[in-house]
């Protein structure tokens, strides 16, 4: 046997050397699928299907991998990965490359094996699909699940019809019949219907199988011609139905080791024209047995107990069998190899011996060649050399077949001989033998008349006394007992009649006529003299039993007498139940095979034999209860020994006490009408009947009165129930009203909560809106702030530009003054040079005066330089203080601007902001007014200063006139005047600078006037100028102090203005 592992390969060879399957197993190849992981595992195959040619098959594993195996081309290919397990496959569509696969998600998909693409996707099932049946044309398919079956058109892949069923009745299988347009549906209640495919009209329904072999069908198979249906289930029986005659024509019983059938399939043959004779039966042990349904012979089998088969599929031409094993692998079998022993020709009938020509005359050199040849042989026969196994074999099959050919009945003597040889009749023919032995007339009309009288009043309440689980068995027992009571009145009062008839009713429950006639025959023959002492037990019969027991076992009888056990205890229970309480079904049937085959006295002998065979346990019984229990329950006793003992007693009992001398021979029931049965004390029965009738009438009166009372009570109860119902209804209405009110309150609370949630949502939306508005407002404020900052920066830039312009003008003025000073110095030096030239003549004269003058000049120059240094130091201090004040003012402005910006960010309301803007505007206007006033004041101060300058100019002019008079001190004046000319320039320039810093800028003409005025001072005398410059110096310092004070006040006002605006 070759083995192939698919592994991770998507294509390859199935076998690598020519397969040579062994005759014993017929396996061509074993296919397994292991993963190539580090820890490999087996991927189990779940389903397999052949195509219409039978040379290709597809198989799917539980991971959804679907492979195509070409047995002729020795190739396999992976055609699809569905990623989920497949539950059914079909590969015989009219497009040869397409196949159907049912998946675990209840869907059906159609794929192409060549293109490996999805052709269609069909949905509609709500449970797993376990069967796909394709029509012979390949254009229609039926998919079956546990709750529905659906018919699909494979040209359009649309659903045509859907078969719905009740939830209590499940579907076993729905499939197409071959070579026809018929759909066969099999349900879990064993009902089988045939439907027309086009119209879905029910063509016929198969009848129910016989109850003697009633099994629940699980699996089905049909021959290729669609004429025979095989059905099996959880049993070893196989039912064969003829679909043309619509009846069950054969039941095949498999060997006892087969307990359940899991799969059935017919093996096709090319020469049987579709009427397949070989059926493959897969049982629960994993072995698939192939049997001939005509000869019931086992032909061959595949699988074993160690390597069992899970499911199998046979190719359409019958050459291959594909089986999925229980270990998940796939086996391919060769049918030709498996049937090789069966199909081989028989051996030749004639063997020819040929003499060879002699080469030497010596007889020792004689050589004889023996060859076998076939001259002629009979027609080929499978049965000639086949070792057959009969599935169901009866011991007397050939004998009974010969006897059954007699039409007048069986031979009783031969039956007795057969019975003594085997101990019992064959189960298959027991009922037929009993009917022949009892010579039942089968009076259908008479029995129908008895049945038509209905249920006898004595057995109306039979189920109360004998509660039988089976309703059918109870009805049959009731009808049988009623027929007996209508036949003879005594049977309506016989208390043990149900016990007597029950085993026969259970045995013949499907044929009530035979049941009645068997019981009636039993009563007439084997119950003779039972009713003579009615209603007491048959004392005469019991006396016969006691006499026979006394003759054969006195010790046992004495034991019964010692313990006060009478024949009514050790014999009557066995008779009234006809041994059904103490024997099993098989033992009871075996016993009555012998009872019905012998004289009626055999039954009495059987009672004695039962006691004698049970003498050991009976001798150990000491209490009466133990004896009662013993004769009412089954005991460990060999019924064959009891029967043999009964035959011994029948032969060895003396004639004077033998029961057959007092019992009549067997008398059969008359044909047409049943005989009159009056072997009972009629007056007692009539009296009991009259009394019973009277009691019945009294009971009827009582029942009528009780019925009236019950009706009244019922009315009262009904009224009470109605009142109670009304009250309950009112209470329910009240509770419902309360419930509704609570529901309304709850709904109102829910509404309030919803409104609250809605209000919360609205608040959140409002808050979000406010946040958005606030963000927009902040963005607007930021934009305005940015615009303000831009405006402030522009103003700062403008101010800085003006400051730079002012500084440049000041620097240019300073440069002009320096140039003028340099010019004055040059003029001074030129004038001094001229003066020195003029005074060289008188230098000697004035040498002494010059020395004095030089000393005086040195002192005065020292004093004047000290004054200049002091003045310069004071000017520097004033300039530094002004600069510090300006820096402080600018820092205060910056701080004020920062505070204004911070204050603007804290404004949230437009109205408040507008008011602030208005207030700021008002303050700005007031500030502008104040600035105008300050500016006007500064202009007034400047005008006053110009007036003072004019006064000083006038005073200087007068001083010039006076200086012209001081000719004596001209030399000293000139020297002193040079120094005085420098001092006024230094003082006037800071004055101009201070006034220019305070007011913004000064006219250049005023500075030029000051310079021209300082030039005119050279004509003033030294003494007068000294006094005048001292007074002017003091006045100038006072004015500088006032100017500084005003600047400080203005700077403080600028710093306090933002605070006023903020308020």
Swiss-Prot record:
InterPro entries: Rab-GAP-TBC_dom, Rab-GAP_TBC_sf, TBC1_cilium_biogenesis, WD40/YVTN_repeat-like_dom_sf, WD40_repeat_dom_sf, WD40_rpt
Region annotation Mediates direct interaction with PJA2: where it falls in the sequence: 1050-1053
A family per Pfam: RabGAP-TBC
Domain of life: Eukaryota
Subcellular location: Cytoplasm, Cytoskeleton, Microtubule organizing center, Centrosome; Cytoplasm, Cytoskeleton, Microtubule organizing center, Centrosome, Centriolar satellite; Cytoplasm, Cytoskeleton, Cilium basal body
Domain named Rab-GAP TBC: residues: 424-599
Designated name of the protein: TBC1 domain family member 31
Annotated source species: Bos taurus
């Amino acid at each position: 046997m070759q083995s192939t592992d698919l592994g991770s390969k998507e294509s390859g060879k199935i076998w690598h050397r020519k397969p040579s399957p062994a005759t014993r197993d017929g396996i061509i190849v074993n296919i397994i699928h292991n993963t190539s992981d580090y820890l490999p595992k087996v991927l189990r195959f779940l389903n397999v299907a052949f195509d219409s040619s039978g040379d290709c098959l597809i198989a799917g594993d539980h991971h959804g991998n679907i492979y195509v195996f070409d047995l002729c081309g020795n190739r396999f290919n992976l055609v699809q990965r569905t990623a989920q397990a497949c539950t059914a496959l079909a590969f015989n569509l009219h497009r040869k490359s397409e196949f159907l696969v049912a998946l675990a998600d209840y869907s059906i998909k159609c794929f192409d094996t060549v293109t490996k693409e999805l052709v269609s996707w069909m949905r509609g099932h709500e449970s797993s699909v376990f069967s796909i049946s394709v029509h012979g044309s390949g254009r229609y398919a039926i998919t079956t699940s546990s709750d529905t079956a659906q018919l699909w058109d494979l040209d359009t892949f649309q659903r045509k019809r859907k078969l719905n069923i009740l939830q209590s009745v499940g579907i076993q299988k729905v499939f197409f019949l071959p070579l026809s347009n018929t759909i066969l549906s099999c349900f879990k209640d064993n009902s089988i219907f045939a439907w027309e495919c086009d119209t879905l009209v029910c063509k016929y329904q198969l009848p129910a199988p016989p109850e003697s072999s009633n099994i629940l069908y699980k699996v089905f198979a049909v021959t290729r011609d669609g004429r025979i249906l095989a059905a099996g289930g959880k049993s070893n029986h196989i039912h064969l139905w003829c679909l043309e005659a619509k009846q069950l024509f054969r039941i095949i019983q498999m060997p006892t080791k087969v307990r359940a059938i899991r799969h059935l399939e017919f093996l096709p043959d090319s020469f049987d024209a579709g009427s397949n004779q070989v059926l493959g039966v897969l049982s629960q042990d994993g072995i698939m047995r192939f049997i001939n349904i005509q000869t019931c012979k086992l032909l061959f089998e595949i699988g074993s107990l160690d390597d069992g088969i899970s499911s199998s599929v046979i190719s359409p031409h019958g050459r291959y069998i594909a089986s999925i094993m229980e270990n998940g692998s796939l086996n391919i079998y060769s049918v030709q190899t498996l049937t090789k022993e069966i199909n081989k020709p028989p051996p030749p009938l004639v063997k020819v011996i040929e003499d060879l020509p002699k080469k030497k005359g010596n007889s020792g050199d004689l050589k004889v060649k023996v060859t076998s040849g076939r001259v002629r042989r009979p027609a080929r026969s499978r049965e000639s050399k086949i070792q057959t196994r009969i599935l169901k074999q009866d011991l007397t099959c050939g004998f009974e077949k010969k006897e059954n050919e007699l039409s007048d009945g069986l031979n009783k003597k031969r039956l007795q001989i057969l019975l003594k040889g085997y101990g019992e009749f064959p189960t298959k023919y027991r009922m037929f033998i009993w009917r022949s032995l009892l010579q039942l007339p089968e009076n259908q009309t008479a029995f129908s008349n008895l049945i038509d009288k209905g249920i006898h009043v004595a057995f109306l309440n039979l189920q109360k006394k004998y509660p039988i689980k089976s309703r059918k068995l109870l009805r049959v027992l009731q009808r049988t007992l009623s027929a007996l009571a209508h036949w003879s009145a005594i049977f309506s009062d016989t208390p043990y009649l149900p016990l007597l008839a029950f085993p026969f009713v259970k045995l013949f429950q499907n044929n009530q006529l035979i049941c009645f006639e068997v019981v009636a025959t039993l009563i007439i023959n084997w119950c003779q003299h039972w009713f003579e002492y009615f209603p007491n037990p048959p004392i005469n019969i019991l006396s016969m039993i006691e006499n026979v027991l006394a003759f054969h076992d006195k010790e046992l009888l004495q034991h019964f007498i010692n313990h006060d056990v009478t024949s009514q205890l050790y014999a009557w229970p066995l008779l009234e139940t006809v041994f059904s309480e103490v024997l099993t079904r098989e033992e009871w049937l075996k016993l009555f095979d012998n009872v019905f085959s012998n004289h009626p006295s055999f039954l009495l002998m059987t009672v004695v034999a039962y006691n004698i065979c049970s003498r050991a346990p009976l001798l150990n019984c000491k209490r009466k209860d133990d004896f009662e229990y013993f004769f009412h329950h089954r005991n460990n006793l060999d019924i064959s020994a009891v029967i043999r003992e009964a035959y011994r007693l029948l032969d060895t009992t003396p004639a004077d006490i033998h029961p057959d001398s007092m019992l009549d021979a067997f008398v059969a029931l008359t044909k047409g009408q049943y005989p009159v049965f009056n072997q009972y004390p009629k007056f007692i029965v009539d009296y009991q009947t009259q009394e019973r009738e009277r009691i019945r009438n009294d009971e009827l009166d009582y029942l009528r009165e009780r019925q009236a009372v019950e009706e009244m009570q019922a009315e009262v109860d009904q009224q009470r129930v109605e009142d109670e119902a009304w009250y309950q209804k009112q209470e329910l209405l009240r509770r419902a009203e309360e419930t509704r009110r609570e529901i309304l309150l709850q709904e109102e609370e829910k509404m309030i909560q919803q409104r609250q949630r809605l209000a919360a949502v609205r608040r959140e939306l409002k808050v979000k809106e406010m946040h958005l508005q606030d963000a927009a407002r902040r963005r607007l404020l930021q934009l305005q702030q940015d615009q303000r900052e831009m405006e402030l920066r522009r103003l700062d830039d403008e101010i800085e530009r003006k400051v730079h312009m002012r500084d440049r003008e000041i620097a240019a003025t300073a440069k002009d003054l320096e140039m003028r000073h340099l010019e004055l110095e040059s003029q001074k030096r030129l004038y001094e040079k001229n003066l020195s030239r003029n005074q060289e003549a008188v230098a000697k004269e004035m040498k002494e005066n010059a020395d004095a003058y030089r000393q005086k000049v040195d002192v005065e120059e020292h004093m004047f330089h000290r004054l200049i240094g002091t003045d310069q130091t004071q000017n520097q201090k004033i300039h530094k203080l002004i600069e510090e004040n300006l820096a402080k003012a600018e820092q205060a402005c910056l701080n004020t601007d920062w505070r204004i910006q911070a204050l603007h960010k804290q404004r949230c309301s437009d109205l408040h902001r507008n008011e602030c803007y208005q207030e700021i505007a008002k303050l700005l206007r007031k500030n502008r007014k104040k600035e105008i006033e300050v500016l006007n004041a500064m202009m007034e101060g400047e005008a006053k200063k110009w007036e003072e300058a004019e006064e000083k100019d006038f005073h200087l002019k007068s001083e010039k006139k006076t200086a012209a008079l001081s000719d004596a001190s001209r030399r000293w004046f000139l020297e002193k005047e040079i120094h005085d000319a420098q001092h006024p320039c230094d003082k006037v320039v800071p004055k101009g600078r201070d006034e220019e810093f305070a007011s913004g800028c000064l006219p250049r003409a005023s500075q030029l006037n000051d310079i021209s005025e300082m030039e005119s001072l050279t004509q003033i005398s030294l003494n007068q100028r000294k006094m005048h410059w001292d007074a002017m110096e003091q006045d100038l310092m006072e004015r500088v102090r006032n100017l500084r004070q005003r600047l400080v006040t203005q700077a403080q006002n600028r710093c306090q203005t933002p605070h006023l605006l903020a308020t």
